């Protein structure tokens, strides 16, 4: 190993040609011999650069539709040979192997091929073999060899060659090697994850990979370090959103914004405007209305106190009128499919407010994984993509819900899916009026939601509690009748819950006695 290693010979083989020609010219200007393959070689030659085909080095042509190009001792010997080991140098001389001091590789676009929904055979052909092999060989020998797998490192390499007269430092080579191993690990993770989906059963080993998007100021609390990584998904959401203005997103901003956007994406744009306001990953107000402004107002009226400093998600592009309403209180983040010029002009006066646009909504039915770390391991499950139609509900009481009650029950059930358990949601006319979240007993969630609704009615000067004439959703069954009775006392007229308790008969009897309509979903929406 040496600190300064000369760079005399480089092998370039990339799928993403971004910055390739500029890098090639910078290397050639320093007298570096360029080796390459296929399309990369053509791109360099088209730019007027002298390039030697790898086939000239190996003595073998590319074969098997390009599957075999660089898998040869003339390549890997040139990468792996220790430059300060006499035996290695003798072997190189004996077999006519010349050293390769730099490998520039970015891999076949496997992740992008999967993301676009390609057929099985196309996905298989986009599993890179030679690229990862060269990356790993070069990275292992980083004492002498540089390996670049990220376009963003091209300028770093060029700057170092200029600063050290055609040499690289050990510190840079070591960092590049770490980046390289992280890339091959993430690549293999993507392939393994896709293969596991084809097999259809949990794999014996599972890895998770991502690309650093942002080093955060801190995590949930100031004493915790944190960073934000991307998994390569192109689905609309906080990870792919465009930030139009405002301060850098924090750890908690990202977490809450994701929760808000996932919730509001449950409501199709074609079914009308919807708004969700989130605090600490729980909704403090959700509503639908004829206009986006009215949807925001109704969501805000559910819990005006908690909405302060919250995250707002919209299912339609933000307009100027809604932006004016939102600007009246302190808001951390607004995320929407878009924002018109008037809305952006309004928010420009609020320099710290973060505005994100997504160019669409997330697909709540898209398959995926939910991952949680526990001491010594991970819990992995499918995303909760469960959805129900009114036709799938079981009416279990003497009275059936009215059409309006049924519409509100379906709305409440959708919201309950996104509330921390134990979750109780009061809804009236397409808007939440009370949310009980995260309590250890279901009856406490029922009481808290009703109490908050009553407090809000008093603050707004209304003559009756907001829960009067509402419906209630429970994310899991009522283990006793007390929660249902509490909801009835608060003025609820109908309930939706999974059912399945050993005391279902008691709960149904209590509903009938109170004149409530109740439906069972047969589906639970625990959220922890």
From Swiss-Prot:
* Domain of life per record: Bacteria
The record's annotation in PROSITE patterns points to: MGS
GO BP term, example: 'de novo' IMP biosynthetic process
Q: Which residues form the MGS-like domain?
A: 2-149
Sample GO molecular function, one term:
IMP cyclohydrolase activity
The UniProt record lists the keyword Transferase: yes
**Where does this protein act, in terms of pathway?**
Purine metabolism; IMP biosynthesis via de novo pathway; 5-formamido-1-(5-phospho-D-ribosyl)imidazole-4-carboxamide from 5-amino-1-(5-phospho-D-ribosyl)imidazole-4-carboxamide (10-formyl THF route): step 1/1; Purine metabolism; IMP biosynthesis via de novo pathway; IMP from 5-formamido-1-(5-phospho-D-ribosyl)imidazole-4-carboxamide: step 1/1
GO cellular component entries: cytosol
Q: Does the keyword Ribosomal protein apply?
A: no
SMART domains xref list: AICARFT_IMPCHas, MGS
Recorded catalytic reaction(s): these are:
(6R)-10-formyltetrahydrofolate + 5-amino-1-(5-phospho-beta-D-ribosyl)imidazole-4-carboxamide = 5-formamido-1-(5-phospho-D-ribosyl)imidazole-4-carboxamide + (6S)-5,6,7,8-tetrahydrofolate; IMP + H2O = 5-formamido-1-(5-phospho-D-ribosyl)imidazole-4-carboxamide
Keywords of the record, alphabetical order, are: Hydrolase, Multifunctional enzyme, Purine biosynthesis, Transferase
Which Enzyme Commission number(s) are on file for it?
Answer: 2.1.2.3, 3.5.4.10
Q: What is known of its domains?
A: The IMP cyclohydrolase activity resides in the N-terminal region.
Read off the NCBIfam families from this record. PRK00881.1, purH
Protein family according to the UniProt entry = Belongs to the PurH family.
PANTHER family registered for this protein in UniProt:
BIFUNCTIONAL PURINE BIOSYNTHESIS PROTEIN ATIC, BIFUNCTIONAL PURINE BIOSYNTHESIS PROTEIN PURH
What is this protein's record name?
Bifunctional purine biosynthesis protein PurH
Q: Which organism is it from?
A: Roseobacter denitrificans (strain ATCC 33942 / OCh 114) (Erythrobacter sp. (strain OCh 114))
């Amino acid at each position: 190993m040496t600190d300064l290693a000369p760079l005399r010979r480089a092998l370039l083989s990339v799928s993403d040609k971004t910055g390739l020609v500029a890098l090639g010219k910078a290397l050639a200007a320093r007298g570096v011999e360029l080796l390459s393959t296929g399309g990369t070689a053509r791109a360099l030659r088209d730019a007027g650069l002298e390039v030697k085909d790898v086939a000239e080095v190996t003595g073998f042509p590319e074969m098997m539709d390009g599957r075999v190009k660089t898998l040869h001792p003339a390549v890997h010997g040139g990468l792996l040979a220790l430059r300060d080991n006499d035996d290695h140098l003798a072997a190189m001389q004996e077999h006519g192997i010349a050293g390769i001091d730099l490998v520039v590789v970015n891999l076949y676009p496997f992740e992008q091929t999967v993301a676009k929904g390609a057929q099985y055979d196309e996905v298989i052909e986009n599993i890179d073999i030679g690229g990862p092999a060269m990356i790993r060989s070069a990275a292992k020998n980083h004492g002498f060899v540089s390996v670049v797998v990220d376009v963003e490192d091209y300028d770093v390499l060029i700057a170092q060659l200029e600063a050290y007269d055609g040499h690289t430092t050990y510190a840079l080579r070591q960092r590049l090697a770490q980046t390289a191993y992280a890339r091959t690990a993430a690549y293999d993770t993507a392939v393994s994850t896709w293969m596991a989906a084809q097999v259809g059963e949990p794999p014996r080993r599972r890895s998770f990979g991502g690309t650093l998007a942002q080093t955060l100021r801190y995590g949930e609390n100031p004493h915790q370090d944190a960073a934000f990584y991307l998994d390569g998904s192109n689905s609309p959401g906080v990870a792919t959103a465009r930030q139009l203005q405002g301060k850098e997103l924090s750890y908690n901003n990202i977490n809450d914004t994701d929760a808000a956007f996932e919730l509001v994406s449950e409501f199709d744009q074609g079914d009308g405007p919807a708004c969700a306001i989130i605090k600490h990953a729980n909704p403090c107000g959700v509503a639908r209305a004829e206009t986006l402004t009215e949807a925001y107002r109704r969501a805000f009226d559910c819990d005006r106190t908690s909405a302060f400093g919250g995250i707002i998600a919209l299912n339609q592009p933000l307009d100027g009128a809604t932006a004016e309403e939102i600007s009246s209180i302190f808001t951390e983040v607004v995320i929407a499919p878009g924002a018109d010029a008037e809305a952006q002009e309004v928010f420009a006066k609020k320099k710290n407010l973060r505005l994100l646009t997504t160019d669409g909504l997330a697909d709540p039915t898209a398959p995926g994984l939910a991952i949680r770390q526990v001491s010594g391991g991970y819990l992995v499950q499918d995303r909760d993509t469960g959805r129900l139609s009114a036709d799938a509900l079981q009416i279990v009481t003497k009275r059936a819900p009215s059409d309006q009650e049924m519409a509100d029950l379906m709305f409440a059930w959708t919201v309950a899916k996104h509330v921390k358990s134990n979750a109780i949601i009061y809804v009236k006319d397409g808007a939440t009026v009370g949310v009980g979240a995260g309590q250890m007993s279901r009856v406490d969630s029922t009481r808290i939601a009703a109490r908050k609704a009553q407090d809000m009615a008093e603050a707004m000067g209304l003559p009756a509690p907001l829960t009067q004439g509402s419906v209630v959703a429970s994310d899991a069954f009522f283990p006793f009748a007390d929660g249902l009775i509490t909801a009835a006392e608060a003025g609820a007229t109908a309930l939706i819950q999974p059912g399945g308790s050993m005391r279902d008969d008691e709960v149904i009897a209590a509903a009938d006695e109170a004149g409530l309509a109740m439906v069972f979903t047969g589906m639970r929406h625990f959220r922890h």
